[in-house]
């Protein structure tokens, strides 16, 4: 069973216990999160959900810089920055909480790191453990671009 499906099944009550990532739990709908208990974080499968931008964007180091670029992009190109992600809820919440509002989310089903190269998005949010794939695709993590720390967890349905 896929890790996302475990979260869904716990949320709909058709599963009592399962293993999945903390990131997938936090990405799920709040109604689903309220039905699931983290029994134990397993201290493996550690990764971070991060904001990554193309290396050539040398003037962008922080989220505040990204906010500035987003407004410039909107004013000059008359469109919003496109952010490719498999984590739309966490990405939207994080960017809004940091004051970045001029963006459009692009759903990614895989190989998110390729989106800027193909011109499908200007930046991405993605899960990474070492950053190697990001670097191989000429992307770098913003200094304050960590959205969430994740790891494998034992999860259970909360029985009321």
What kind of feature is each model-predicted range?
Residues 158-160:
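Conserved small/polar residues in nucleotide/adenosyl-binding loops
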Residues 16-21, 122-128:
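Paired acidic/hydrophobic, glycine-rich loop segments that form the ligand-binding mouth/hinge
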Residues 1-8, 104-116:
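Short helix-initiation/N-cap motifs at beta->coil->alpha
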Residues 65-69, 88, 102-112:
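Active-site glycine-rich loop that binds ribose-phosphate moieties when present
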Residues 14-16, 78-82, 103:
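Short active-site oxyanion
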Residues 12-19, 23-42:
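Glycine/small-residue-rich loop that forms an oxyanion/phosphate-binding "nest" at active or ligand-binding sites
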Residues 28-40, 133-148:
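Ligand-binding "clamshell"
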Residues 34-92:
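A conserved helix-loop-strand patch within extracytoplasmic ligand-binding domains
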